[in-house]
C-alpha cells in the first residue's frame, strides 16, 4: 500500500475508532516535540504514552497532507474532550511508512490548551 493510502487509512481508522493500531510497525519510533520532548520506541510504548490523548479525541480533520516517497506530513486539527471541557489542538504529524506500516511518527503541537 502506498504511503498516501497508509496514512489516509490511519486517519480514517482513528476517526471511526477502528483498527488504526494495525497500521503501526512493532518497532515504531515516536517523538513528541513538545516541552519536554518525549521519545519512545516500540508500538506498545507508543500506545501507552499516548493513551490519554487518544481517549480525548471527539473528532479530527486532516487539513493538509503532503506525500514524498515514504514520507508524509499531515496538518491536523483535533477536537478533544477532557473532564475540564472541550478544546482543539492543531498538530503537525510527520510519518515514515515502510512495508505498509508507520515506522516513525513525529508530532509538533502547542501544549497550552491541554489540561494540566
Features from the language model and the residues they span:
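Short, surface-exposed coil-to-beta transition loops
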Residues: 58-61, 86-93
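Short beta-strand edge/turn micro-motifs at domain boundaries
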Residues: 93-116
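Hydrophobic beta-strand positions in extracellular immunoglobulin-like domains
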Residues: 78-80, 97
Amino acid at each position: 500500500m502506498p504511503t498516501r493510502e497508509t496514512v489516509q487509512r490511519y486517519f480514517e481508522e482513528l476517526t471511526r475508532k477502528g483498527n488504526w493500531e494495525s497500521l503501526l510497525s512493532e518497532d515504531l519510533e515516536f517523538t513528541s516535540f513538545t516541552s519536554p520532548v518525549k521519545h519512545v520506541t516500540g508500538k506498545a510504548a507508543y500506545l501507552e504514552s499516548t493513551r490519554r490523548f487518544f481517549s480525548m479525541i471527539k473528532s479530527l480533520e486532516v487539513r493538509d497532507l503532503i506525500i514524498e516517497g515514504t514520507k508524509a506530513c499531515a496538518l491536523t486539527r483535533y477536537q478533544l474532550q477532557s473532564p475540564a471541557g472541550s478544546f482543539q489542538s492543531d498538530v503537525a504529524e510527520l510519518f515514515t511508512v515502510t512495508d505498509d506500516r508507520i515506522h516513525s511518527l513525529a508530532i509538533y503541537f502547542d501544549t497550552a490548551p491541554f489540561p494540566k
